[in-house]
Amino acid sequence: MPIDNENYKSGVDLLLNKQNCESPNFKFYVEWIFKNLELHQSQNINDTAQYVFNQYVNSKTCLDKQKTFYDAIFKKLSSFTKLPVGAVLPEFEMKKINGDAYRFSDFKKEKVNIVMFYDPLCEHCKTEVPKITKEIEDLEKETNQKVGKLAVLNGNPSLWKDFVDKNNLKDWENVTYKDGDTKTQENLDAFANPKYYILDKEGKIILKTYGYSFVRSQLLQ
């Protein structure tokens, strides 16, 4: 069965039929659905994310009794509508780890590129970043192709260099926001840690999460 909006909506209806925010497994199912949708964003199934939210989450019951859950799903929904798959990551200005100015247009794009946002204090970042940098390094050796790699600090600059040194990021371009700049983070929808954009050679977003198998398949095409 092809992965498209109609098939996905039918599957969602089968799973969530007669359930609501007060049902025992409802939160687990909805979170699982959104995680799965994130992995398949390249299939252009953003309509399904909006459908799940409107049909099953956007209710007075959820808002009153599961406010934290409601807000979390609403935030996930925004990731499907802002900078969707197929959009070109916009131009931005930041600064390098040595303080020099940096423009995204300076980024040398390869066949496949990864833009990663992280905070050194984020527990998920501490485990995911070294794993990903190792996987990307291994993929480059296996396929004999370079991956464009840009790491954006979303946290305290005083922890920056140490995190780069310890997590195999020296081979990446390392940048962070200019002092006082909050607009760029908003424009890039980069408030989550870690957050990833996988881009093609033209800078178009082809995936909004990191997937080893996906990156490998793109390199081998």
Regions found by a protein language model. Name each.
Residues 103-133, 149-152:
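Short active-site neighborhood of thiol/selenol oxidoreductases, capturing the structured segment around
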Residues 1-102:
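Oxidative protein folding and maturation machinery
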Residues 102-103, 206:
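Generic structural signal for well-ordered beta-strand positions
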Residues 169, 180-219:
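Thiol/disulfide oxidoreductase modules built on the thioredoxin-like
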Residues 126-166, 181-184:
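Structural microenvironment flanking redox-active thiols in thiol-disulfide oxidoreductases
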